[in-house]
Amino acid sequence: MLVRLLFASRAAEPAAATIASICQHSQPRNAERGITGVLVCGDGVFMQAIEGGRAAVNSLYGEILRDARHRDVVLLHYEEITERRFVG
């Protein structure tokens, strides 16, 4: 079963450095886990949509909650989906 999760957070460090770090580490792992999505950042605030299998998305969101690069993480939306909106 596929799900889509949308969350917002604040960058713990300057956003440009944080985005580079997140992308460098997450892109290969997300591909291995079958996770797709989109990350948007402005004024030190992140908004990200994550899509994939329920277990993989839930696990990744748990990692994000524990990630020191994110502060004030807020879950905005979570739904079951039949197809991805953001493909690799």
Give the location of each predicted region.
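Charge-rich, low-complexity N-terminal segments
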Residues: M1-G88
